[in-house]
Amino acid sequence: MADELAVRISMFFFGQLKDVMGAESIEVTLPLGSTVGDLISRFEIPMEGNSGIRIAADGNIGAPLDLVLKDGSEIAFLPPSSGG
């Protein structure tokens, strides 16, 4: 029986962040009501200053830090785009 007070999510890392985090993807279980911001804090994901890292939640780029995570959510941390 699944824990009804928790959500299981998958995180995906791209670019240099994949090297910093030491993995391409991580699956985690968090307390119900956890947000994207909570996830960043818990795993110390480097988002300081103008890192340019964008967050996609379930395929939607630009997820706010106060977005409440749902069971089965997929959160991707995308490197800045470079034009040319």
Tell what function each PLM region has.
Residues 1-83:
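Ubiquitin-like/PB1-type beta-grasp interaction modules and other compact soluble beta-rich domains
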